[in-house]
UniProtKB/Swiss-Prot annotation:
Involved in the biosynthesis of lipid A, a phosphorylated glycolipid that anchors the lipopolysaccharide to the outer membrane of the cell. This is Acyl-[acyl-carrier-protein]--UDP-N-acetylglucosamine O-acyltransferase. It comes from Bartonella henselae (strain ATCC 49882 / DSM 28221 / CCUG 30454 / Houston 1) (Rochalimaea henselae). NCBIfam families: lipid_A_lpxA (TIGR01852), PRK05289.1 (NF003657). Pfam families: Acetyltransf_11, Hexapep. Pathway: Glycolipid biosynthesis; lipid IV(A) biosynthesis; lipid IV(A) from (3R)-3-hydroxytetradecanoyl-[acyl-carrier-protein] and UDP-N-acetyl-alpha-D-glucosamine: step 1/6. The gene is lpxA. It catalyses: a (3R)-hydroxyacyl-[ACP] + UDP-N-acetyl-alpha-D-glucosamine = a UDP-3-O-[(3R)-3-hydroxyacyl]-N-acetyl-alpha-D-glucosamine + holo-[ACP].
Length: 274
């Protein structure tokens, strides 16, 4: 614990593991099972509950509560965990719950993530690396969020939904179906509105890859054939495009929810200029 500073008003329970150069601010409460990585900073009134691991160089702001029991009536109080990766920024009032003993028992958050004020991550979620949740984002239990996803303020995600990597969800949207990688979903009842072109460019996709994915996703949702045939056609048409392969694999790994699709039957994905 070399270089670690704990404010005299903070309560660090016996058994808690704190790394080097950790700062624990006024009125924080850290549970006996918590593991706090090197270089972490906990500002005032942060609560770390249960078996919660916070990765190195993460910063947690006032009144965040990490590792509380899940809000799940099936949970019977068993041993469950919350794991948060390194270099995460967790702003004021954020809540993240441990997994439930009626499911996988683990809530997992990746590295380099940003969670703005009052965002909520429920039990048994898996959140990837480099994601950004704006203020008041709420994701329900068992949700999977891929790498580099951005979710706008006030958006909500239904339980068991999968959000593919590099996807974007607009503010105050309610996503109730699986969103494909690179997809953009907007609306109070969110629909697939196009592709996250900015995210694709940030990911280093070349122009040819972007155009291939545009065409592939338009094929998927043109409703001219049964959906399984459309998926097969896309896979055959673009076997060398990794972005298309990612979308096809995402669809084949079907979860418990339906897919987020365009608004009207027969609508195509917008062929926006880049």
């Amino acid at each position: 614990m070399s270089g670690t500073k704990i404010h005299p008003t903070a309560l660090v329970e016996k058994g808690a593991q704190l790394g080097e150069n950790v700062f624990v601010g006024p009125f924080c409460h850290i549970s006996s099972e918590a593991v706090i990585g090197d270089g972490c900073s906990l500002m005032s009134h942060v609560v770390i509950m249960g078996k919660t691991t916070l990765g190195a160089d993460s910063k947690v702001f006032s009144h965040a509560i990490l590792g509380a029991e899940p809000q799940d009536n099936k949970h019977k109080g068993g041993y469950t965990t919350l794991s948060i990766g390194k270099n995460c920024t967790i702003r004021e009032g954020v809540t993240m719950h441990r997994g439930s003993d009626s499911s996988v028992g683990m809530t997992i958050v990746g590295d380099n993530c940003q969670f703005f004020c009052y965002a909520h991550i429920a039990h048994d979620c898996r959140v990837g690396n480099n994601v950004t949740f704006a203020n008041n984002v709420m994701i329900a239990g068992h949700v999977t969020v891929g790498d580099y996803v951005i979710i706008g303020g006030g958006a909500a995600v239904h339980q068991f939904v999968r959000v593919g990597h590099h996807a974007f969800i607009g503010g105050v949207s309610a996503l109730v179906g699986d969103l494909i990688p690179y997809g953009t979903a907007v609306g109070v009842q969110a629909k697939l509105a196009g592709l996250n072109i900015i995210g694709m460019k940030r990911a280093g996709l070349e122009r040819k890859d972007i155009h291939a994915l545009r065409h592939a996703v338009a094929m998927l949702f043109d409703h001219s054939k049964p959906f399984k045939e459309r998926v097969s056609d896309v896979a055959s048409f673009y076997p060398a495009s990794q972005s298309v392969v990612d979308v096809v694999n995402f669809i084949k790994e079907k979860g418990k929810r339906f897919y987020c699709t365009p608004k009207f039957e027969g609508d195509r994905i917008k062929e926006n200029k880049d």
